């Protein structure tokens, strides 16, 4: 039985995530193993509009499995949000003979893929985002690496915190989702974790937790803040203000964990 699909495209869009290159490699080699041609679309949906494509075979994805970022590059594309932009992208798909498209990215990438599917293009979305905010999957590509990287950074920070008896506020990415902050907070044993899914009261969810930890004998504290919940700097300043009245022997810093980019747009 012959394949109905003979030629597909693959693109990465939005913020890059660890593991995207490994995913590109898997798509290309799986397609080639089934006799399906594969083309790479560079710079996401912008490349689909402008026709920025490259033929891909097994050799073109050799030795990229451990590389960070994405060899196909990524870019935001406001034009694709418009009907005219989507029509241009569809025209490119027909011009280069695509029977299907594989889109790797987060929620914005998936929205773009859904819009394109309305033109009759077969689309597969592969969740690649550190935010871990895509339904129907336990983990998205890049989430585990981002979580472990943040934990490694905070473990190193803790050594200094213990030496100086400090309270540190660490803001991590996640866009409007608190998965990354929550997983990291649990892994490092944070005193408090603030996530956008739940509103918080500073006195109840931060100050009181620090107070109880202090009474139990702890001399250093770490507060993890998801970027969608609050500003890490603002929380740190509020802790400093409280410290002037209650904890004059505790210092407060604010460290921004390494940022990888999110997938808000197409």
Question: Which sequence ranges carry the predicted segments?
Answer:
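Gly-rich Lys/Arg/Thr-decorated short loops/hinges at beta-loop-alpha junctions or inter-strand turns
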Residues: 7-10, 64-76, 128-138, 163-165, ...
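Short glycine-rich or small-residue beta-strand-to-loop segments that form or flank ligand, phosphate
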Residues: 7-15, 70-75, 100-103, 168-171, ...
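Short gly/pro/ser/thr-enriched loop/turn and capping motifs at secondary-structure boundaries
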Residues: 45-48, 110, 129-134, 200-202
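A glycine- and small-aliphatic-rich helix-loop capping segment at beta-alpha/alpha-beta transitions
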Residues: 25-34, 54-60, 115-125, 141-145, ...
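Glycine-rich oxoanion-binding loops at beta->alpha junctions
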Residues: 1-2, 48-103, 109, 141-153
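N-terminal phosphate-binding or glycine-rich loops at protein starts, especially the Walker A/P-loop
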Residues: 2-49
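Accessory alpha-helical/coil subdomains and C-terminal extensions
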Residues: 103-105, 111, 115, 122, ...
């Amino acid at each position: 039985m012959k394949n109905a699909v003979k030629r597909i495209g693959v693109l990465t869009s939005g913020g890059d995530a660890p593991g995207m290159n490994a995913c590109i490699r898997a798509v290309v080699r799986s397609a080639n193993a089934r006799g399906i041609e594969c083309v790479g679309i560079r710079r996401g949906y912008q490349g689909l509009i402008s026709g920025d494509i490259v033929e891909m075979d097994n050799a073109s994805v050799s030795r990229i499995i451990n590389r960070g970022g994405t060899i196909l590059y990524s870019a935001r594309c406001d034009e694709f949000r418009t009907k005219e932009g989507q029509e241009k992208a569809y025209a490119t798909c027909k011009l280069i003979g695509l029977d299907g498209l594989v889109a790797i990215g987060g929620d914005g990438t998936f929205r773009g893929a859904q819009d394109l599917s309305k033109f009759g293009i077969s689309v597969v979305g592969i969740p690649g985002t550190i935010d871990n905010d895509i339904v129907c999957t336990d983990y998205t590509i890049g989430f585990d690496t981002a979580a472990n990287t943040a934990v490694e950074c905070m473990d190193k920070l803790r050594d200094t915190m213990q030496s100086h008896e400090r309270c540190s506020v660490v803001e991590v990415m996640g866009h409007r989702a608190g998965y990354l902050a929550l997983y990291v907070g649990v892994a490092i044993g944070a005193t408090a974790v603030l996530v956008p899914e739940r509103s918080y009261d500073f006195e109840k969810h931060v100050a009181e937790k620090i107070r109880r930890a202090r009474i139990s004998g702890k001399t250093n504290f770490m507060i993890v803040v998801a970027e969608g919940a609050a500003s890490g700097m603002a929380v740190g300043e509020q802790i400093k203000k409280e410290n002037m009245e209650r904890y004059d022997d505790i210092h407060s810093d604010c460290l921004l964990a390494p940022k990888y980019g999110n997938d808000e747009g197409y």
